[in-house]
Amino acid sequence: MRATSDHGRKLSRRGFGRHLALAGLGVALAYGGLGSTLGLAAADLHVLNWQGYGTDEAWAVKLFEQRTGCKVVHDYFNSEQEMLTKLRTNPGTYDVVLINSVFTRQAATEGLIQPIDTSKITNWQDLNPKLRDSTYLNTGGKTYGLSWVWGVTSFAYNTDVIKTKPDSIEVLWDPSHAGRVGWRDDPVEAVAFGAIATGQDPNNPADLDKVRQKLLALKPQLKTFWSSEDEWNKHLAGKDFDVATYWSGSAARSAKAFHLPVEFVVPKEGAIGWFDGLSLAANAPNADCALKFIDFMVSPEFYVKWDTDVGAPASANQAADDKLPADAFNRVVMGQPGMQERLFYMAPLTDEQRKKFTELWEQVKTELGK
């Protein structure tokens, strides 16, 4: 979601993005904005994304270029707000843009992205209907984003320390882990955790005082705040915490790529869900290449290798899920029965909500620091 995206992102995310720098950049070239597009060929395909988040995998860019003749050029952002600003200030520059679903409708309303002709997407019918047909991506009978990957913001634990897999969010408040809990410093995410732990809807908690009190109860538990996947991995490797909030795709990479003793949990109370989509920028100068690129990105061919090689969020393409190895994280954990029903997909926040959540979290942090 990095909406809180693995994204966050999210690799946020919703951590994603919460997002990685694992991809080779030898083929996918970065440039720094409108000024550096001067002199580029008409066939150049301009992609705006988090750095290291799938679309700039060197092998994939090379394969796509060989097949289509479309040269892929990347530009990057470090936050959703920066992404929106780049689209606003550089009209007619970009072709494909990665947008967390929370921001898709806003981008469409502002005229920053255009409808996608889904008849040109060969993988359309294989996309998970719950994500593909979401009102976050579709409005007025038109599709403004193609669901690409999804993930969960929940928690992961150190399997060297905790021998029995926890099934409740209350493990974060368990006195046996006092001084051994890691927590991401993000107001929206913090309020969402507090809401879920108090039995409320994280998108619209009715009793923010209950959320505040639950978060204040973290005081004896906290070891440290964290902000990036790399930081999380270093803390875990340094044995700084037993359990910590985390992103699903990042947990898979921590275990697979860095061989850390990590297991991800989606508790019985539920967890934060997010998904990212690929959109066609308004006035895209190379729309034909853009649609081919989006179709390739959502294909099983791309996704299975991406996930197998470095680890990725879960695919929105059900056919891709079926082609993953039997022991793959995104089949064993993310594909377990009833998973979607246990997720609270984050909805777009109003400015008033964001302000309230930020003020609440800043107050809580002040108290926690005393």
Please tell me what each predicted stretch does.
Residues 209-218, 258-282, 328:
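Periplasmic-binding protein-like
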Residues 103-108, 237, 243-261:
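A ligand-binding cleft/hinge motif common to bilobed small-molecule-binding domains
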Residues 42-107:
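Early extracytoplasmic/lumenal segment of secretory-pathway proteins
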Residues 234, 337-370:
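Conserved C-terminal helix/tail region of periplasmic/extracytoplasmic solute-binding proteins
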Residues 281-342:
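Mature extracytoplasmic/periplasmic domains
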Residues 54-55, 77, 98-237:
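Extracytoplasmic ligand-binding site segments that recognize negatively charged/polar headgroups
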Residues 1-15, 22-31, 38:
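N-terminal secretory signal peptides
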Residues 154-161, 195-199, 274-287, 305:
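A bilobed periplasmic-binding-protein/Venus flytrap-type ligand-binding module shared by bacterial periplasmic
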